[in-house]
Structure formats: structure tokens, C-alpha cells
């Protein structure tokens, strides 16, 4: 498994990278995990979500915020600097339990990463993602093509969650967004510290990892 840190990248560019790598992985290349942050973007999933957007596309454009229809599962969500995004391009068919188990394992990566920093997080039956009580700290939405996964999870790390004010989070009116900073304040880890722990948890839960030559990697 290659683990590649893409840094700060636009959504469309990361989507194109995933799709290209998916074709290679489906043909037998090594599985790849991309870790990154996105420039501000609001995405709509396969379940829709346009009705949960509180502002217009034109206004978003004036603020430099993209609005994108995504191929991932789920409803509306947003991405921004200060949020750790993980995109595993993995072969689903070879994994016991298939996509359902993979989804569970992604949640486990997040739960164990948060536990490392002293936060008790959990699954919520019927509500995908990872929660701290009624506060959502991580959204998960995946897609599968040629029995290979892409898209993944978005874990809120930093202070600024203002983009969530523009949407009804995942179409759930009672859902609140939180982050490691919101929960831990001055004791919150840096983005790099969260990336490092997240990478270790992926290795522990999914597989041993190797580093792609010539790429920034963890």
C-alpha cells in the first residue's frame, strides 16, 4: 500500500488522480492511500443534497468556494483547509466482508486515531461517519468502480468550521459539526501529527505500506 501526502489540492484535481490510479489498481498495481486537504468546496453525493445548501452557487463563486456533484455515496458535505481527507484506492473484492467491512474499517481508522489524542468517538447506527455524542467529527462517503474503492473520509482537525454553516450537515437538521480543535482546544494536535497517526492506523488496520518513489509520502 502506497501512502501519498498530496498536501493542499483542489477537489477536481484529486478526483482525477483517484480515477487514474483506480484504473491502475484494478489492473493489478499497488493499492494507494491519498492523504490531503482540499481548497474550500461543497460536494453533493449520490443521495443528492442540493436542498440542504443554504446559499446560492453564484454567491459561493464570489467567495472562491466550488460546488461539485460527486460520485461518492451520501448527501451534502464540505471540505476545506484544516480538514484531513483520506482517499483509499483499494481493491474491494479481495477483502473479506467486501465494501461493508471496508466502510467499518475506515470508521475504525478514525476512531483509533481520535483515541490516540484522548477523544472517545463512536459509530452511530443509521448515521454514517464518526461521532462524539451528537457532534459529527468525520464524514465518510465512498464509491466503487471495477471492484476498486475511491473517495473516503473527511476528518475535521482545525478551528474553522464556518463552511458547515452553509449546509445542513449530511441532510441531518440536528447534526452539529465538531473538530479536534473544538474538542481539545489548545491541546489539539497539528495536522501533521494527525496525518502521522492516521497513516499508522491505516497500516495496522488494512495492510503494511510502502512508499511511492518520487512522491511526498508518510
Swiss-Prot record:
Keywords associated with the record: Acyltransferase, Cytoplasm, Transferase
Keyword Cytoplasm: yes
GO molecular function: lipoyl(octanoyl) transferase activity
Site annotation Lowers pKa of active site Cys: residues: 136
Extra information: In the reaction, the free carboxyl group of octanoic acid is attached via an amide linkage to the epsilon-amino group of a specific lysine residue of lipoyl domains of lipoate-dependent enzymes.
Cross-referenced CDD domains: LipB (cd16444)
One Pfam family from the record: LplA-B_cat
Native source species: Nitratidesulfovibrio vulgaris (strain DSM 19637 / Miyazaki F) (Desulfovibrio vulgaris)
Pathways involved: Protein modification; protein lipoylation via endogenous pathway; protein N(6)-(lipoyl)lysine from octanoyl-[acyl-carrier-protein]: step 1/2
Gene that this polypeptide is encoded by: lipB
Domain BPL/LPL catalytic: residue ranges: 27-210
Catalytic activity: octanoyl-[ACP] + L-lysyl-[protein] = N(6)-octanoyl-L-lysyl-[protein] + holo-[ACP] + H(+)
GO cellular component assignments: cytoplasm
Primary localization class, coarse: cytoplasm
A single GO BP: protein modification process
Name by which UniProt lists this protein: Octanoyltransferase
The organism's taxonomic lineage, starting at the top: Bacteria, Pseudomonadati, Thermodesulfobacteriota, Desulfovibrionia, Desulfovibrionales
Enzyme Commission identifier(s): 2.3.1.181
Residues forming the catalytic site: 170
Family as reported in the entry's similarity comment: Belongs to the LipB family.
Entries under InterPro entries matching the protein: aa-tRNA-synth_II/BPL/LPL, BPL_LPL_catalytic, Octanoyltransferase, Octanoyltransferase_CS
